[in-house]
């Protein structure tokens, strides 16, 4: 059995789909590291620290899950964490091509690092962080897609963003 796995992502914000995959990965592996990518090129709404806090809250009930922020190459982070498996989620066939290319690149850079793909529960298959942010930006209720504290934080973040735009 592989002991250590990494589930990497930006998690901006963490959704119920992410939480579902984390719970299932926690049953499959002895230790799961949620690797939150700093990834400034994506211009996340939440800071790395806020995303670490959110994931820590969402995974607090899972004893074998650890939340860690990182920057740089994922394969280097995996090596530093002594992880042998990357867990990735596939929501739809459209995700497969990108994930397949990413898995092959990671394998080329680190041949001992395996990629494992999990699909979300049907009720979470359409949820993405991008869609959740879009719904929230237009005043929609996102509470059915994210943890209640994450929904509140997103609402506050968008209100602050709109207030800052109004002051300029």
Swiss-Prot record:
Pathway: Cofactor biosynthesis; coenzyme A biosynthesis; CoA from (R)-pantothenate: step 4/5. Keywords: ATP-binding, Coenzyme A biosynthesis, Cytoplasm, Magnesium, Nucleotide-binding, Nucleotidyltransferase, Transferase. GO terms for biological process: coenzyme A biosynthetic process. It is found in: Cytoplasm. The keyword tRNA processing does not apply. Gene3D superfamilies: HUPs. It catalyses: (R)-4'-phosphopantetheine + ATP + H(+) = 3'-dephospho-CoA + diphosphate. SUPFAM superfamilies: Nucleotidylyl transferase. The record marks 18 as: Transition state stabilizer. ATP binds at residues 10-11, 18, 89-91, 99, 124-130. It is an enzyme of class 2 (transferase). InterPro entries: Cyt_trans-like, PPAT, Rossmann-like_a/b/a_fold. GO terms for molecular function: ATP binding; pantetheine-phosphate adenylyltransferase activity. The keyword Nuclease does not apply. Substrate binds at residues 10, 42, 74, 88. Its cofactor is Mg(2+). GO terms for cellular component: cytoplasm. Its EC number is 2.7.7.3. Pfam families: CTP_transf_like. Belongs to the bacterial CoaD family. NCBIfam families: coaD_prev_kdtB, cyt_tran_rel. Reversibly transfers an adenylyl group from ATP to 4'-phosphopantetheine, yielding dephospho-CoA (dPCoA) and pyrophosphate. Homohexamer. This is Phosphopantetheine adenylyltransferase. It comes from Shewanella denitrificans (strain OS217 / ATCC BAA-1090 / DSM 15013). The gene is coaD.
């Amino acid at each position: 059995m592989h002991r250590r796995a990494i589930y990497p992502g930006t998690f901006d914000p963490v959704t119920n789909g992410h939480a579902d995959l984390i719970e299932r990965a926690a049953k499959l592996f002895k230790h799961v590291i949620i690797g939150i990518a700093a990834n400034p090129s994506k211009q996340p709404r939440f800071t790395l620290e806020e995303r670490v806090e959110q994931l820590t809250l969402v995974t607090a009930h899972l004893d074998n899950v650890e939340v860690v922020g990182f920057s740089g190459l994922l394969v280097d982070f995996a090596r530093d964490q002594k992880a042998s498996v990357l867990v990735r989620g596939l929501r739809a066939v459209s995700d497969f091509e990108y994930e397949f290319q990413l898995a092959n690149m990671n394998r080329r850079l680190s041949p001992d690092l395996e990629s494992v793909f999990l699909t979300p529960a049907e009720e979470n298959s359409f949820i993405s962080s991008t869609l959740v942010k879009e719904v929230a930006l237009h005043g929609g209720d996102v509470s059915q897609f994210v943890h209640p504290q994450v929904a509140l934080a997103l609402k506050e973040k968008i209100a602050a963003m709109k207030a800052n735009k109004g002051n300029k």
